[in-house]
C-alpha cells in the first residue's frame, strides 16, 4: 500500500493508494510515477470540493448535505491508462502536522481517502482511441458512416429479411400440399372397398384443413410483397424469378378457392332468408285463421243472445196480457150503482169524512183501468220493436 499526501488549501489530505495486480500474478510493476501523477490529477477536483464542503459545514452546521462516497458506493473515475475507485473513511483520532514554521497553519484533514487503482485492458484502450479517431474524422468530413456506405449494399440488407420470410412461407405451403396428396394416396390404397364417396369426403376434409393452415401463412406472405417487387426491379436473375412464380401457384389456387367460399356463403344466406320468409307467411296464415274463428264465435254468441232476449220479451208480453184480461173481467162484475152513488160516512167522534166500501172499490177499479191502459201501450210498443228486429235476426251476422 502506498501513501500519498495531497495539499488542498490549509489541509493535508492523506491518501491510501492500493494498486491492484495485473492478471493472475501479483505483479504491480505496471504502476509507475507517471500513473501516480495521473491519480493525483484525477482526485484533485473531488478533494477540493470535499474540503470546501467541510469548511461550509463548520460555519453553518446542519444545513448542507453532501454526497457520501462509501465502500459500498465508491467514486469511479477513468483515465488514459488506469481506472480508480475511491471513497472516504472517517478518522476518529485527530492528527497534527509537526512541520517547520512556514507550515504552521497546515492541518490534517479529518477524513482518510482510500483509492484503488487498476490497469485498463489494452483492447479497451485501443478501441477508445480508434473510436475517438473515427469521431474526429466524421466531424471533420461532416458525414457519418451510415451515409458513406454504397446504396446497393443498403438495399440488399433491407431486402434479405422479407425475402427469406416469403421463401419460408412458400416452402411450408408446398410441404402442406405434398402431405395432403400423400395422405390421400394412402387412404385410397388402404381402403379401396369404401368407394368414391368416402375418398371424396376425406379429400374434402384434407383440403379444408390445408386451407385453414394456409390462411394465416398467406396473410403473413402478403405483407412483404412490396419488398419482392423492389427486388425484381433491381434485376434478379431469370431462373430465380421463374422459381418464385412457380412457388406462387398454390397461393393463386387458394385465391381461386376464396371466391368459391364466398359464393357458398351467399347461397347459405339466401336459403336462410327464404326459410325465414316461409315461416313468416305461415304465422300470418295462422293469425288470419284464428281471427276468422273468433269472429264466427262472436257472431254465433250474438245470435243466441238476441234469441234469448226475444223469448223473454214474448213471455213477458203474454203474462201482461193475461193479467190485463183478468182485471177487465173483474171490473165487468162490479155494479154500476156502486160506481155512480158514492156514500160517505161521518164519524161521531171525529169531524173528517171517510169513504165507504163502494167508493174504495171504485177507486181501486179506476187504478186497475189505468194500469191496463199502460200495459196495452207497452204491448203495442214491444210489438213494433219486435217487427223491426225480426228481419235483422233472420240475417247472418259477418
UniProtKB/Swiss-Prot annotation:
Pfam families for this protein: UPF0492
Region spans: Disordered: 181-306
Biased composition (Polar residues): 276-292
InterPro entries, sorted: SLX4IP
Family statement drawn from the similarity comment of this UniProt entry: Belongs to the SLX4IP family.
Name the record gives this protein: Protein SLX4IP
Source organism of this protein record: Xenopus tropicalis (Western clawed frog)
Gene that specifies this protein: slx4ip
